[in-house]
Amino acid sequence: MAINLDDKKAIVAEVQEAANGAHSVVIADARGVAVEAITVLRKQARENGVWMKVVRNTLARRAVEGTEFECVSDVFKGPSLIAFSSDHPGAAARLFTDFAKANENFELKAAAFEGNAVDVNMLAKLPTYDEAISRLMSVMKEASAGKLARTFAAIRDQKEQEAA
């Protein structure tokens, strides 16, 4: 189906707007995946703050040109499903890797974060903000418990030396 020039410009502008407000991008090939499954994926994407769309390759290349995601423009071959994470850098990657496990025809092509092409699985393993805060708090809590134990050991050693 032919798209007129104004529609093409609108699509490029829409993708550029999503790219400019995003932390990361993930590109996948969804050939052979049922429409119902893609509909469920789109719903999950909206719930997780992920913007996704099937975009023609030339339009996608033009849209990411001049953005920090230009590093993945060479993977736009064949049908491309592009997803931008705006809330959390790993949201789209996590969503797509989980979906790929359930749908063998869903192929992850590439991902980019902070201007660099990265492994999709590495990006998916990034902790969310809440997970990172809880990890930091547990490390701080463990550190204070360790300090307390070392203090008790030092007091014990000091008393043993005084008794001797």
Swiss-Prot record:
<dbReference type="InterPro" id="IPR022973">
    <property type="entry name" value="Ribosomal_uL10_bac"/>
</dbReference>
<dbReference type="InterPro" id="IPR043141">
    <property type="entry name" value="Ribosomal_uL10-like_sf"/>
</dbReference>
<comment type="subunit">
    <text>Part of the ribosomal stalk of the 50S ribosomal subunit. The N-terminus interacts with L11 and the large rRNA to form the base of the stalk. The C-terminus forms an elongated spine to which L12 dimers bind in a sequential fashion forming a multimeric L10(L12)X complex.</text>
</comment>
<keyword id="KW-0699">rRNA-binding</keyword>
<keyword id="KW-0687">Ribonucleoprotein</keyword>
<dbReference type="GO" id="GO:0005840">
    <property type="term" value="C:ribosome"/>
</dbReference>
<protein>
    <recommendedName>
        <fullName>Large ribosomal subunit protein uL10</fullName>
    </recommendedName>
</protein>
<keyword id="KW-0689">Ribosomal protein</keyword>
<dbReference type="Pfam" id="PF00466">
    <property type="entry name" value="Ribosomal_L10"/>
</dbReference>
<dbReference type="GO" id="GO:0006412">
    <property type="term" value="P:translation"/>
</dbReference>
<keyword id="KW-0694">RNA-binding</keyword>
<dbReference type="GO" id="GO:1990904">
    <property type="term" value="C:ribonucleoprotein complex"/>
</dbReference>
<dbReference type="InterPro" id="IPR047865">
    <property type="entry name" value="Ribosomal_uL10_bac_type"/>
</dbReference>
<dbReference type="GO" id="GO:0070180">
    <property type="term" value="F:large ribosomal subunit rRNA binding"/>
</dbReference>
<comment type="function">
    <text>Forms part of the ribosomal stalk, playing a central role in the interaction of the ribosome with GTP-bound translation factors.</text>
</comment>
<comment type="similarity">
    <text>Belongs to the universal ribosomal protein uL10 family.</text>
</comment>
<dbReference type="InterPro" id="IPR001790">
    <property type="entry name" value="Ribosomal_uL10"/>
</dbReference>
